[in-house]
Amino acid sequence: MKGLESRIIRMLETLLGTRLVSIILFGSSIYIGRGRDVDILILIDSISGLDEKMDLEEKVKMLLNRSFNYEVVFDAHILDLEQFNENLKIGSFLSGLSLGYQVIYDKNNVEEKIVEMLKTLSKSRYIMVNKYGRWNLSKIAEIKLRIKEKNH
């Protein structure tokens, strides 16, 4: 996976330049170890509107999918820092990061912000249901935090 990560970083640095803040891999390819696609969350400094967001997401998908000859399919999600911070709450799509994520590039210490969200999530009662099953995100967040504490 390291080769994949470094290629992703290089391509996104080239495409986004200094706007690139963080890259986070998440989704079933991370928490199950396999999946149809690789979900990638890209944080940039700012987005001027929905049109730019959609345009950038499409450019990223095309760039990555072509670069990997469609052998690996990428699903890109782009947020600016404000949107990222707004989504660090229980019930947002970022709650799913508790199932598994990997920060592969970071200029803004997003790991700390995600850990804070996991702490809040671990104290709540939140269940997520998706096509892979029913997930007690509160319990999973609690376990992830214990593992992180052990590893540091």
Language-model-detected regions and their locations in the chain:
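Catalytic core of pol beta-like nucleotidyltransferases
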Residues: 1-22, 30-35, 45-152
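Short beta-strand->loop micro-motif that forms the acidic, two-metal-ion catalytic signature
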Residues: 39-43
